[in-house]
């Protein structure tokens, strides 16, 4: 076995990618059924069914029809699905998805977008899918921009891969906060023991001033993380 290490390559921004292509917009429509992927990363990502929405197709009043893919079966970082499609006219295309992201309550999830095996621009590394208990119809984007992709005539492969995206920064921040609080907790245990006396004043502010100060700082840091997620 061997491991090959490649240098990181900076991707161009979406603004750079789209520059000069605005006149290439097209009105062609290509329909892709989510339950018929070209390929998936593993056997756990497979078509499932939804009967809660009457416009999810195909539907049958008597039979269970496979008409969606994903849910909790497609949420592990690195899992992906691919779809093959064919373009007749060169131009800019929006990729509009009908989806329901009700797994991460109050938060968005992210997918990395590949076209023919390449991430076309930096922002495509973290396309966002906002939380809602209802189905949504939205073009791929990152909350600030709606992405358009330039495609030449012929067959193409669209790949959507689970990624932490910008939430990766949040996860690292929370991990650092938890690590600091655990260290503070161990310092407190040295003073109080595992069964502290609730009637005793341990004088934490006097005996452990650095610990008290750090707990305040970590509380503020955690509040900032919550504000970022909810904002």
Regions found by a protein language model. Name each.
Residues 1-231:
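Extracytoplasmic
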């Amino acid at each position: 076995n061997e491991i090959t290490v490649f240098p990181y390559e900076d991707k161009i921004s979406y603004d750079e990618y789209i520059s000069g292509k605005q006149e290439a917009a097209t009105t062609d429509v290509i329909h892709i059924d989510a339950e018929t992927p070209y390929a998936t990363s593993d056997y756990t990502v497979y078509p499932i069914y939804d009967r809660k929405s009457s416009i999810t197709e195909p539907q049958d009043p008597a039979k269970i029809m496979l008409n969606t893919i994903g849910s909790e079966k497609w949420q592990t970082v690195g899992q992906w699905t691919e779809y093959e499609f064919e373009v007749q006219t060169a131009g800019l295309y929006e990729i509009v998805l009908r989806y329901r992201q009700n797994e991460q309550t109050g938060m968005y999830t992210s997918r990395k977008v590949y076209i023919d095996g390449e991430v076309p621009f930096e922002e495509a590394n973290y396309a966002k899918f906002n939380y809602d208990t209802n189905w949504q119809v939205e073009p791929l984007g990152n909350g600030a921009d709606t992405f358009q992709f330039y495609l030449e005539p012929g067959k193409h492969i669209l790949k959507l891969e689970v990624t932490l995206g910008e939430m990766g920064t949040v996860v690292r921040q929370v991990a650092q906060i938890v690590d600091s609080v655990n260290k503070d907790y161990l310092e407190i245990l040295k003073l109080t023991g595992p069964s502290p006396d609730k009637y005793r004043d341990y004088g934490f502010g006097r005996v452990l001033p650095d610990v008290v100060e750090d707990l305040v700082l970590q509380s503020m840091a955690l509040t900032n993380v919550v504000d970022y997620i909810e904002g």
